[in-house]
A protein has these predicted regions:
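STAS-like cytosolic regulatory interaction modules
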Residues: 1-58, 62-110
Length: 110
């Protein structure tokens, strides 16, 4: 089971922590997190949202859709979205979805 947590870090920055298996069973929670980020943006003039994925063990289509939705919302509302501390599974899923990286992700363990 996965988890999503939205944390207001102050200084116009929000961190969204993803951990565990971010799959279809999390779709409602992920949509809620996008709405929560938007509400915080409306209150405090958000300039940056960071998605921390160090604890992600699986990033399925719903997780990738969440990242796209959040990035799109940021483009429309004027805040930057970046990814940090990506686990191997998260990096591979994001890379496979078409986000470019300077370095290719390592191959999955055998």
């Amino acid at each position: 089971m996965g988890e999503v947590q939205v944390v207001d870090r102050g200084s116009r920055e929000i961190v969204v922590f993803l951990s565990g298996d971010i799959g279809d069973q999390m779709a409602d929670s992920l949509h809620g997190a996008v709405d929560e980020v938007s509400q915080m943006e409306g209150l405090g003039g958000l300039s940056h949202a960071v998605v921390d994925m160090h604890g992600v063990t699986e990033l399925g289509p719903s997780g990738v859709a969440f990242l796209r939705e959040l990035a799109e919302r940021g483009r429309h509302r004027g805040f930057e979205v970046s990814f940090s501390a990506m686990s191997g599974p998260a990096h591979r899923a994001v890379e496979a979805a078409g986000w470019p990286f300077i370095e290719a992700s390592p191959p999955p363990p055998a």
